[in-house]
Regions:
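Membrane-anchoring alpha-helices and their flanking helix-loop junctions
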Residues: 1-294, 298, 304-310
């Protein structure tokens, strides 16, 4: 590809910027008003805790329906994301940097002494910008950390669906594309069905919100996790029946281990005395779970990693 053409493809247009801002606005507004299970987060060092409205699945369904209606009425193109993928990538990257700058400035100026908003600085500008200043910064009552990871997961689905439609329009739909889309939909739907599990993850509990998390959530997740779909759009790969069965078996084996292990971890963090496989949990160092799937975590993680090759 010509370098000039490549650079032009990465240059955000006003359309791509509007698409991005519209998407984030939708998540902010409807994420605040749609009903959902309110889940308490971990108890922080000052004894306080945040509460999270887990309505991501409803947000997903509503957005897909709205986009479907918009496409049916010719108000928008279902391939708009696939057509402007590089533009949206660069626009989101710039957006993540701008958000991080605001978080850094606001965090440094904060005099709040609560666990969520107390500034944590090292004196190293790059380190503080990268790892963040505040644990749980908010904007107009919106918990930004929870918001961004939701945006990344849902954005991944939207990219995939747009690529799928483009593949159909170009008569380039393959068994590999169908399997990839199916596996991703299962994983993403599972995430939102069990969205409350996110409240007990290290990212939410302990990581401050800086460029590492902002970039990871809204750039890395949607744009790198969808690489397989982009590749299959231009490279039609047909599979034998045996290959399809093998891919499905490995995927579902990895998925079941992943889901079971993460459920055990979530239950343990919420209640350290909860039974794991009918037995009291074994713990290493007071915090590390060594029951259920977790004594075999190395093998389990390896299986899950191998299952990722099926995508």
């Amino acid at each position: 590809m010509d370098l000039t053409l490549l650079l032009h493809s990465f240059t955000p247009s006003w359309t791509s910027v509007a698409m991005l801002l519209g998407y984030f606005t939708y998540l902010a507004i409807f994420g605040s008003i749609l009903p959902g299970k309110v889940v308490p987060g971990a108890t922080l060092s000052d004894g306080t805790r945040l509460y999270y409205r887990c309505n991501g699945l409803l947000l997903l369904f509503l957005l897909v329906i709205l986009l479907g209606i918009g496409g049916w009425m010719d108000l928008l193109s279902p391939t708009a994301i696939a057509d402007r993928g590089l533009e949206l990538l660069s626009a989101t990257l710039v957006f993540s940097a701008l958000v991080t700058n605001v978080l850094y400035i606001v965090g440094c100026k904060s005099h709040d002494q609560s666990s969520s908003l107390r500034p944590h600085t090292t004196g190293n500008l790059i380190e503080d910008w990268w790892f963040g200043i505040q644990l749980n910064p908010q904007f107009m009552g919106l918990d930004l950390k929870f918001y961004f990871v939701r945006a990344g997961m849902l954005g991944w689905l939207l990219i995939n669906l747009s690529v799928l439609v483009k593949s159909i329009q170009e008569s380039n739909l393959s068994q590999s594309m169908i399997l990839y889309q199916l596996f991703c939909v299962i994983y993403i739907m599972d995430y939102f069905i069990h969205e409350e599990y996110m409240t007990s993850t290290w990212d939410i509990i302990a990581e401050r919100l800086g460029f590492m998390l902002v970039f990871g959530d809204i750039v890395w997740i949607p744009f790198t996790f969808s690489i397989q779909g982009w590749w299959l759009l231009r490279n039609k790969v047909e599979l034998t029946i045996a290959a399809i069965i093998a891919n499905c078996l490995v995927f579902f084996m990895g998925y079941l281990v992943f889901r079971g292990a993460n459920k055990q971890k979530h239950v343990f963090k919420k209640n350290p005395k909860a039974l794991i496989w009918g037995r009291p949990p074994k713990v290493i160092g007071g915090k590390l779970l060594a029951s259920g799937y977790w004594p075999f975590s190395g093998a389990s993680q390896g299986t899950v990693t191998i299952s990722g090759t099926c995508w």
